[in-house]
Regions:
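Conserved AMP-binding/adenylate-forming core of the ANL superfamily
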Residues: 22-23, 32, 40-85, 89-93, ...
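Structural core segment of the AMP-binding/adenylate-forming
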Residues: 69-70, 97-181, 503
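ATP-dependent adenylate-forming carboxylate-activation enzymes
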Residues: 82-83, 100-118, 130-137, 266-286, ...
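AMP-binding/adenylate-forming catalytic core of the ANL superfamily
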Residues: 109, 116, 126-131, 403, ...
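Gly/Ser/Thr-rich phosphate-binding loop
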Residues: 177, 289-294, 303-365, 378
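Conserved AMP-binding/adenylation subdomain of ANL enzymes
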Residues: 224-242, 250-290, 305
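Conserved ATP/PPi-binding loop(s) of AMP-dependent carboxylate-activating enzymes
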Residues: 372-376, 387-421, 459-461
Length: 557
């Protein structure tokens, strides 16, 4: 069976078209159409306040005009370093209306990492949080010569009538101003800045967990295409949906969900701190979302909250999960709370806008699978050695895809672009670096990142497979499998398991738990897969998106 025969189509929901007409134009044009049609409709709920599409139309126009009047031109980069809050939405839409490129910057980066990213993209303007301005940015301001304007926003500076953020002292060669002051003092109509489908709209940096962070250039056409695929897949009832997600907008998954809500006129609930479980539970209760999105680790945090488990989930249609593997037993536990068939695992990456696969919205969902390739997406699994030869369906290899959602390339990284985007068989293919397989029904299973695969005596150990086994043990709350150099065998690695104990076993002695886990591994795992080293930690480090940070674990090993 060939991948070109698209064996996954037989598993599509009824009514989902395998191909689709891809929209043209720009994302800004799409936003404006929706905002003008429904100005009084709620666009976003945030900390008890509501921003309408009309508010967003006006404020984004003022923001865009302000960018133009301080000298920014089409193709210049505006960087946003905020948690999920209304100002982020204003900056997204306003940046695109000005013809500029938006780039997200994680608030969790160190000053040196911030400086690298701002310089790498030659950012002309930065929108940052008041708490971050003094703690981080002011320390590196002098090392970013391209940056001319810094706009400072605050948590309580809401759409209208919130607490004002005082102006900060100017920095050498830079203008520093409160975000809302900047917005309010400019006219609501920007100058025309027409963008084409092939122009870059988002410059989103990869998390840097596998090396130096790189900026993925995503075009208006990429984002509109992926939105169309997502909407075709989900069959959203636009007037009847409310979206709530803990994915931060500085991450492509969060930016995509937020932008999709704007593009389809769907209200969204903004979560500034996804680790504040009590706040998420309160918003779930009060806003009644139909769609919830989170990474697995945050769903696990919610499952540990008694108030979450008592919520009425009858109005929730889907709980989407992505960005990391979700242990099968935990998926079933979540569905025992939110309802059977509501868990929707997806897979993608920053470089693909981000979605590549998803489990059917209404049809059969397979636990442990990231679902089926989306409409208008070519998909293959190829050999790990050279990335050229298709492996048979059912065998493991590198996942590659081609489609309108695939990025233009990496910003100023031609060699890395050539390595990731390879032209063959009449298409440009994104080589994802993920290892996986496809079953006979077309469902995809991501086994591991190629860089997370551990080699033991010539055998491949897939970390997600081993971690999934350990999640069945009651003492394991969170775990991560990594490979360490083997000084006795340079061609082999030593398997190490880092464990954050579950709440029920937190007080148990490490030695007793380790002995129990070793016995468990002997029963459940082949000897070469079983960890040789166990480490117990109070908290496993997470990335800014909530994924286990294996780079940090390897760095301290």
């Amino acid at each position: 069976m060939s991948y070109d025969s698209k064996p996954w189509l037989k598993s599509y929901d009824a009514g989902v078209e395998p191909e689709m007409a891809l929209p043209g134009g720009s994302l800004a044009e799409r936003f404006l159409q929706v905002f003008r049609e429904s100005p009084g409709r709620p666009a976003a709920r945030y900390m008890g306040s509501t921003m309408t599409f009309g508010d967003l139309l006006e404020m984004s126009g003022r923001f865009a005009r302000g960018l133009q009047e301080i000298g920014l031109r089409k193709g210049d980069v505006v960087t946003v370093q905020l948690p999920n809050m209304p100002q982020y939405l204003v900056a997204v839409v306003g940046t695109l209306r000005a013809g500029c490129i938006l780039s997200g910057l994680s608030p969790l980066l160190t000053p040196d990492e911030m400086s690298f990213q701002l310089n790498d993209c030659a950012s002309k303007a930065l929108v940052t949080l008041d708490l971050l301005y003094e703690a981080k940015f002011a320390r590196v301001a002098g090392s970013v010569p391209s940056l001319r304007t810094v706009l400072v926003a605050g948590f309580l500076e809401t759409v209208r009538g919130g607490a004002a953020v005082p102006d900060r002292p100017a920095l050498p060669d830079k203008t520093v101003e409160a975000f809302m002051n900047f917005v309010d003092r400019h006219a609501a109509e920007p100058y025309e800045a027409a963008c084409a489908s092939g122009d870059t709209c988002f410059l989103q940096y990869t998390g840097g967990t596998t090396g130096t962070a790189k900026g993925a250039m995503l075009t208006h056409g990429n984002i509109l295409a992926n939105m169309g695929q997502f909407d075709q897949w989900m069959k959203f009832g636009h007037d009847a949906e409310t979206l709530l997600t803990g994915f931060p907008m500085f991450h492509q998954a969060g930016l995509f969900i937020a932008s999709s809500a704007l593009a389809f006129g769907m209200p969204q609930v903004l979560i500034p701190d996804p680790r504040n479980v009590e706040h998420i539970v309160r918003e779930l209760r009060e806003s009644g979302p139909s769609f919830v999105g989170n990474v697995p680790s945050l769903y696990l945090m919610l499952l540990g909250n008694e108030d979450f488990r008592k919520l009425d989930f009858s109005g929730v249609k889907y709980c989407m999960s992505g960005a990391a593997a979700f242990p099968v037993d935990k998926v079933r536990l979540l569905e025992s709370v939110v309802g059977a068939g509501k868990m929707l695992e997806v897979w993608g990456m920053t470089e693909t806008s981000p979605l590549i696969t998803a489990n059917p919205a209404r049809g059969r969902k397979k636990a442990g699978s990231v679902g089926l390739p989306l409409p208008a997406t070519r998909f293959r699994i190829v050999d790990l050695a050279h990335g050229c030869t298709e492996v048979p369906v059912g065998e493991e290899g590198e996942l590659i895809c081609s489609g309108a959602q695939v990025m233009r390339g990496y910003w100023n990284r031609p060699a890395e672009t050539r390595n990731a985007l390879r032209e063959h068989d009449g298409a440009v293919w994104m080589h994802t670096g993920d290892v996986g397989r496809m079953d006979e029904d077309g469902y995809v299973y991501v086994v591991d990142r190629a860089k997370d695969m551990i080699i033991v005596g010539g055998y491949k150990v897939f970390s997600s497979e081993v971690e999934d086994k350990f999640y069945k043990h009651p003492a394991v709350g969170l775990c991560a499998l990594i490979g360490l150099p083997n000084p006795e065998r340079p061609d082999s690695e030593v398997v190490k398991l880092v464990v954050q104990k579950s709440p029920a076993c937190r007080e148990a002695p490490d030695g007793e738990v380790e002995a129990d886990l070793r016995a468990f591994a002997r029963e459940k795992l082949a000897p070469y897969k079983a960890p040789k080293i166990y480490e117990f930690v109070d908290a496993i480090p997470l990335t800014s998106v909530g994924k286990v940070n294996k780079k940090a674990l390897r760095g301290r090993a």
